[in-house]
């Protein structure tokens, strides 16, 4: 079976997010002062061949832990669906 996986990687709460701060300041400078608490992350989409949804999720968690996310400074969320 093939599964489409959406991975959302975000900086851990409480850690400095320089990109988020830069975007927040730029938004304020452009007149969007109501925007606050901006955090910048990234989205990754991939297809995984696996025998089941739990197997696909486990494999992608391994990918995240080893490459796609920094486990010290980032958290990630997965959404798994049949392709």
What are these regions (language model features)?
Residues 1-83:
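Long, contiguous binding/interaction regions
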């Amino acid at each position: 079976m093939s599964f489409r996986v959406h991975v959302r990687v975000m900086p851990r709460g409480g850690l400095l997010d320089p990109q988020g701060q830069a975007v927040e300041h730029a938004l304020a400078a452009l007149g969007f002062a109501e925007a606050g608490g901006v955090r910048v992350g990234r989205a990754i989409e991939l297809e995984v061949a696996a025998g089941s949804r739990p197997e696909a999720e486990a494999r992608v968690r391994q990918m995240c832990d080893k490459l796609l996310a920094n486990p010290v400074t980032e958290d990630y969320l997965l959404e798994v669906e049949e392709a």
